[in-house]
């Protein structure tokens, strides 16, 4: 779900806490901690890319607990001269989900003529600390119509999240209220100035296409084989040792909000 927002991040835009919850010690409330993550950056170097993004950067997690991704603010800046043609679609992905329409949490489209842009997503769901430590979120970037030589960076994206860290799910739904959530599944918003180059293809379909390309050996995104198999020198399949998914996101120098 996506909405245009200002550049700053305010917890009140995502969560309504009572006066008691704001001032009581953490041990006296089920909502242990509301945190804003550090900024994580993704540098878009290709027209199509699927990159890991650390939405919980700098957030102290609770062992054997949970973390709720209450809200996310994404800001972008085109590294281009003024009045360039083209544009981009940005989509947040939960890589745990195998169905592409369920993996897409929300998307946003804008043109290169708008040099700076920002939008927010309200995923509003919890994952376990164990899953969170494996960096389960990705960003799918689809740049179209930008005429730039390969190897240069047309677009920079920054991500910062508002999250709730808690030990137990009990009473959580009674003690916090997520605001501005609409029903009907992921929402795609489009700027009014988007050029005609934007194809009317849902981001879920783009994700499906990208994942299929990756399975065929595409080098745009290298992931772990789902079947945990490999080939020996004779071309026969053999089991490989499973590798964890604690890969680092492709980010630049970050700072705390």
From Swiss-Prot:
Pfam families: MP (PF01107)
InterPro entries from the UniProt entry: TMV_movement (IPR001022), Viral_movement (IPR028919)
UniProt biased composition (Low complexity): 247-257
Basic and acidic residues composition bias: residue spans: 224-242
Cellular component terms (Gene Ontology): host cell cytoplasm; host cell plasmodesma; host cytoskeleton
An annotated GO BP: transport of virus in host, cell to cell
Keywords noted in UniProt: Host cell junction, Host cytoplasm, Host cytoskeleton, RNA-binding, Transport, Viral movement protein
Protein origin, superkingdom: Viruses
Compartments (UniProt record): Host cytoplasm, Host cytoskeleton; Host cell junction, Host plasmodesma
GO molecular function per UniProt: RNA binding
UniProt-annotated stretches for the region Disordered: 212-257
Function: Transports viral genome to neighboring plant cells directly through plasmosdesmata, without any budding. The movement protein allows efficient cell to cell propagation, by bypassing the host cell wall barrier. Forms a ribonucleoprotein complex with viral RNA. Binds microtubules and modulates microtubule stability. Can bind double-stranded DNA.
Protein family: Belongs to the tobamovirus movement protein family.
Protein name: Movement protein
Record organism: Pepper mild mottle virus (strain Japan) (PMMV-J)
Gene name tied to this protein: MP
